[in-house]
Amino acid sequence: SLSQGDIVQAKLDSITKGIKGTPGALNGHFDNDVAIGTLLSNCETGVYGYMEESPADNTPVEVASKHEVRTGSAKILTTISGDQAQYYDIEIESINYNQDTASKNMTIKITDETLLEKTGGIVQGMSGSPILQNGKLVGAVTHVFVNEPEKGYAIFSENMLADLVESTAKNRDIAA
């Protein structure tokens, strides 16, 4: 798997809608070859790196601990056309605190009618889309249920931060 490299802009061209038994996908292309950041690590809990410049909308969001996450309504921030992310309604259906499941901590369901109409639910390319609940970052999308494309798994933001710290420490050691 790709472990390091440049981060470049991407633009979405179309959506292959997910249906029962066949996952959908966001289809796009790299917008240009200009690096906007560097990927340092690619592991089970996500990809980690840094941006050369902060994004235009750089409003800080508090990170929730896994014990602050509740079943119920939440929002996903994802891009399904062009390059502009939007918020969509989801439901956190269940929470799994088992340490053996680093990236399958929550079962989520897309409830937003617009997102369901356009994508059929969770599609390939949505992995990493942030999940917010009560104004805090609680996690990110990781998997789609192939036979129920409106549902999938998500990881706790707390688990992602732990790997970010570990990844940063490893890269600091390599650079030294």
Residues of each region from the PLM?
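C-terminal recognition in membrane/secretory proteostasis and scaffolding
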Residues: 1-176
